[in-house]
Amino acid sequence: MDIEKIVTEVISAVRYDKKMTLSLARELSRRMTEEGEKNGNKLVIAIVDEKARPVLTEVMDGAFLVSHPVATRKAYTSVAIKMSTAKLAEEVGKGGSLEGLDTADGLIFLGGGAPLVVNGNVIGGIG
């Protein structure tokens, strides 16, 4: 699932206020759920605002219990570091530009989290 592509498409299609809104979060969640169902994935979708405060969390039927805290941490991490968690996972490894950051509390280094960027500004994150 290409989370960054979905984020870009939704942000382009939805009217936004340069800030995270519940309607934007709902549309992102709807698209992620649609994609998850199409691929047979049972997702937890966590969306936060620019300060990593929860805006929306949805749990698909049959999602793993561990998916809830993981999705929340992915959304938080993507806002805190302002990059996708997949890219971050590459950068924290030996010789990466963020080597050693993997000891920071609260961050997660698994793909599936992405910042929500509008006109160069991070307005939130999704995990």
Where are these regions (language model features)?
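Flexible, solvent-exposed loop/hinge segments and secondary-structure transition points
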Residues: 2-127
